[in-house]
UniProtKB/Swiss-Prot annotation:
Pfam family, one: Transglut_core
Keyword Cytoplasm carried by entry: yes
EC top class named in words: hydrolase
Keyword Manganese: no
Reported tissue expression: Highly expressed in skeletal muscle.
Entry protein name: Kyphoscoliosis peptidase
EC number: 3.4.-.-
The organism of origin for this protein: Homo sapiens (Human)
Amino acid sequence: MELKKDINAVSIDMLLIVHSEKRRAAQGTLSDQQANPSSLLQRGGGFQGVGNGVRRWQKLEGNDFHENLVEKQHPQQPQVITSYNSQGTQLTVEVHPRDAMPQLLKKFSLAKRLQGDKNGNTRPRQPGGKDAHAYPWDRSSLKSMSLDLQQFEKLDIYASQVTAKSGLDELVSDLLQEAHTDLERVRAIWIWICHHIEYDIAAAQEKDRQAFKPTDILRTQKTNCDGYAGLFERMCRLAGVQCMTVPGYSKGFGYQTGQSFSGEFDHAWNAVYLEGRWHLVDSTWGSGLVDTITSKFTFLYNEFYFLTHPALFIEDHFPDNKNWQLLKPPQSLRQFENNMYHKSEFYNKGMLSAHPETSMIRTVNGKATVTIESCAPTLFMFMLNGKQEHGLLSLRKNGMKLEVYPPTMGTHKLQIFAKGNSDIYSSVLEYTLKCNYVDMGVQLPAELHQPVGPSWFSEQMGIMKPSHPDPIIHTSDGRCSISFSVEEGINVLASLHGDDGPITEETQRRYIFQLHREKQTELKVQLPHAGKFALKIFVKKRQEPGNYIFVFNYLVCCANTKVNWPMFPESFGNWGQDNELLEPLSGVLPANRNVPFKLKLHGIAKVLVKGQDTWPLTLNHEGYWEGSCSTAGCQEVYVMVLENANHNFYSYILKYKVNAQ
């Protein structure tokens, strides 16, 4: 219908209400309480059964090691469609359940209308082309607009400390005391909600869903995702900032890789209008997390969900209206279901991309490879079916590489965790791994921990310039020698681990002999048999108390079944870090032989080798103590030293066994 301009014409907002029996049947009849005009939204909080009675849950982003969770909510947002003719006449159509109060009628009854923009418009405009951001993400920023978070420090502190003394109007007024732009107003509201409103776990567990009113939220300081979104919208409107609540699907707890979404929406968030464009926020996921073990909410602020770049927001938020994706091109529901889900901590910890880019991956010849690119050095770990086994994870300067070898055919769960400056690893990625072939030739030692091979982290811990930069060492004769520079004041400890049954901690170190030459450390390794071994490297600051810290390990492989090397000699506490043994290196000496000895010791007055008899060693011009001793008639041979020439007390430093005749 065309309306001609006339001086006597009257502008009329026409409301057409269309009842859908299918929509009503799918969503159910709302209660009288939910239809209350004072309700923020025509939907309840908490969780409800879905289909076969399985409950949906919503994860409050925060990503602790236990995958902390809360329940998903089910928005039932009415559809509002607005069209304009060439003369500017507006027709608004709303589709909603039969027994629900129309949203537009409720808006007409509000005592306070949304403050208009400069053009006098009272209703927020729908998103258009100028709001859209390019997809995929261009890596330019985690935010949809340029922000300097340091400029918010004073405002954030102020907003987080404001208390709700009475009503919502006064609260918003107090928050705006230090906010002078629309961006600062939105920031103050966001910070206050994220630091004061906790997720209402008890309400979420009730069978009857309830609508959360702003007055109730302020009184209890609790709500669900509907309440978070509704409160954020209401406070923004009171502050004169255009804001909308957006319902849709989300990838929270309970989400299974590759799952399909249908039926009722399970989450709600907000779009806010700033500097001529729409932007996205989720105060529910910005506020904290719920621990699955204790079922307690913990405030854990997550900056990621404030003005998130739409190309990142779409990874776990799919709106009911594709225009609210704010993307060009928009993603389909099928794409949303199939796309890789990078959790917020993936980006919070500086990661940029992961390969493969699909959440479902298959092994090739029994192996799957995952790589991650990051903008800064980051520590990683992984779990395959809940265990840190069957994989080789090597750190790179800007990321990591993981090779996984599933031990059985079938479907496996692969989780990847990352750690920034904190001491807590956070879940950042999850893959579903399908394996149709097992490489029986790959049997990794159970004691092979992560990471494998030297990296920026080992340099940071004082180990530099390794002779073997690769994580895997192959030896044909069962022996190898590894050397590296060691930072001043750092002690190094190494141990060898196989899968041939339990062995003592002492035995684990007896197949490694450690030599020190100035700032250079050499590890001589002899394998007891063929197989795969984990060579673990530990460090400790010499002047500090405490235990040695694990840094990395090598995977040492030998296929020669004839290998059967004995242990190295046993060393005692007086064997110094800078001592050097040239011979004999075998810890087991032949019987009835004269065995040559040669070693370098520092600060020693005399050296003796004691078998059945005692033989002195002499100091040559190169600084080595050398000589020989007979193994006849003895089972053990000791090397003893006298540190002070004025004393007669000798200390044992090395012990050898003699083969039985």
